[in-house]
């Protein structure tokens, strides 16, 4: 159908899943020159969850998706599309999203992955919003899921203590809105990338290298960019929605580090 600007993509259900294995900071003290106080002070992180053998990004994502379906009171085939934000898909292809589709018993619609790492969930949310506003889908499942424990360099204390495994999901549905900031749903989106900064945060493996690779990061540089860019993109999104900072009650940033937040 044609784009109706008073249509809104509204969250009607959400769910999450965390693997059962919990690793406290102290567990790293045996193998790394680090300690609980050091990790807490620099990151705010106290513990993380790691996937167990047999768990993959798609199984974590499926568990979160099922929780979101339960929350919304829907069945898998009520969903038109699944968009899964991940940088740690089970395989090179097919997409982890299609694996979730199969695990949910979903027999219709379409599914694909979005790879934008830290910003992935917001990119996927933006995709879902566009599908709904353009009339291509009525209900979209958006999932963010990672198994970063499988791309860690366990000898690098500056990175391996920061990341964990888990999944979160929301279901968006088309609803009529007024086109004003009083509406429920997604009011505005702002996306940005800058490929020139690749060397600040990347994985040194992939199809071109024949390896899975490990995460590499220039932490202090990432910190500097994150603080400035997060504030700038939030300001742009607020301007587009016609709201001021005073109107906002709750900000949910990427929770990599308490000092960035």
Question: Model segments located where?
Answer:
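Flexible, glycine-rich active-site loops centered on histidine and acidic residues
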Residues: 133-166
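Acidic, glycine-rich active-site loops and adjacent beta-strand->loop/helix elements
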Residues: 16-17, 85-90, 116-121, 144-149, ...
